[in-house]
Regions:
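Short helix-initiation/N-cap motifs at beta->coil->alpha
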Residues: 20, 56-71, 256
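Periplasmic-binding protein-like
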Residues: 3-21, 85-128, 151-156, 218, ...
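Extended ligand-binding regions for polar small-molecule ligands
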Residues: 16-42, 86, 105-148, 167-168, ...
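A ligand-binding cleft/hinge motif common to bilobed small-molecule-binding domains
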Residues: 1, 46-47, 70-105, 273-274, ...
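Export/targeting segments at the very N-terminus of extracytoplasmic proteins
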Residues: 148-198, 231-234, 248-252, 338-341, ...
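Ligand-binding cleft/hinge of the Venus flytrap
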Residues: 2-4, 41-62, 91-94, 157, ...
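Catalytic and substrate-binding regions of cell-wall glycan-acting enzymes that process beta-1,4-linked
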Residues: 123, 259-331
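Substrate-binding/active-site groove segments that recognize
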Residues: 37, 201-225, 230-243, 301, ...
């Protein structure tokens, strides 16, 4: 027996983009098409496999759909069928595969339970209803799928190239800033990429400068004399970000705390607080980024900015800023390992001594 549906997904045929895009199953006569055995894709393909015996169907026992997509991406496999939800997550990580066509109808993603577990199914259905009603499913969808929607593949390709060519010279500065601030070095790198594409001497028409695009006022606030000094700019920005994060109400949990910190970095803590006030007036949750981002653009609307303390602001900008940083961070976090600070000798000695 199935629980209520969570979200709609469909199986998709993917291929290596260096090859010829098939238009239908007829184009795949004699070709090998892989899929993950004992998964949703396996179930979704049951009828298709029976209707198209001319295709060489190959079930694989791999750890994840991402592992299968990676094999198509590096041309180890010509074709595969994976679910659209897995494609959405992987499309800016693996850049050499593409979707040829839908391999079956859309269906609701749900949990399967033994027929004897009616009580458990009812409990799960009640939980899913509550999650949908309170916005929990929308939050989870935003958390796991929003990063891949915020970036085009050409932009993702440029970032992948610069991870190899530019980032190695900067990485130590981001890691040092993590040691100082506690913020993931890959998040700091994502912010810097959004601000300057890792250009040390970037200068905007509004007067912000350097790799982190710090304003004069912020530079004075954090004691940064030279905004073009890469190491000091990254360190100063990390301290400033941590200060913004610490000023948010303690009850705000992750990952919303980080996304709200990013919005404050872009628009200022005061304007963010105005948006949170509007969020509450609109019966939203001011502690959830998914709700606050809907209120931020209203700061440019006279009907709404008249109701808040600081008035007008270009509230659409932090929404776009956070989305782009999340997209870059998603790629960096998948491509590069976290930084584990080394233990200082004195700390090691203290732990090792009897």
């Amino acid at each position: 027996r199935w629980t209520r549906g969570i979200t709609a997904v469909e199986p998709e045929l993917i291929f290596n983009a260096e090859g010829v895009r098939p238009r239908s199953w007829t184009d795949l006569a004699g070709a090998e098409v892989a899929y993950l055995q004992d998964t949703g894709a396996d179930l979704a393909l049951a009828r298709i496999r029976a209707e198209h015996p001319e295709v060489k169907w190959t079930p694989l026992d791999l750890a994840s759909a991402d592992a299968l997509i990676a094999q198509v991406d590096d041309a180890s496999i010509d074709y595969a069928v994976v679910m659209s939800s897995d494609v959405a997550i992987a499309r800016n990580i693996h850049l050499s595969f593409d979707v040829a066509f839908a391999a079956g109808p859309k269906r609701e993603l749900a949990w399967a339970l033994p027929a004897s577990q009616a009580k458990l199914r009812d409990s799960i259905d009640a939980f899913l209803d509550r999650m949908r009603r309170t916005g929990g499913i929308a939050q989870l969808t935003d958390r796991y799928y929003a990063p891949s929607r915020g970036l085009g593949r050409p932009d993702a390709g440029v970032l992948h190239d610069r991870i190899e060519t530019v980032l190695p010279d900067l990485r130590k500065y981001f890691e040092e800033a993590q040691d100082e601030s506690g913020l993931d070095w890959r998040l700091l790198a994502a912010i810097a990429y959004q601000e300057s594409q890792w250009s040390a001497d970037a200068t905007s028409e509004t007067g912000v400068r350097g790799i982190m695009q710090i304003t004069e006022d912020t530079a004075r606030q954090v004691g940064l004399a030279d905004r073009l000094d890469v190491q000091k700019s990254i360190s100063a920005a990390a301290r400033y970000l941590r200060d913004l994060r610490d000023k948010l109400p303690a009850r705000i949990a992750e990952p919303d705390r980080t996304w709200l910190m990013l919005a404050a970095f872009n628009i200022g803590l005061g304007h963010l607080e105005d948006a949170r006030v509007l969020t509450q007036k609109m019966k939203g949750n001011p502690d959830l980024w998914n709700d606050v981002r809907k209120a931020l653009p209203l700061l440019a609307d006279p009907e709404y900015f008249a109701q808040v303390k600081l008035g007008y602001a270009r509230g659409g900008m932090p929404v776009a800023f956070v989305q782009r940083v999340r997209s870059y961070y998603d790629i960096l976090a998948r491509a590069l390992p976290p930084h584990v600070p080394r233990l200082r000798a004195s700390t090691f000695d203290a732990v090792a001594s009897p």
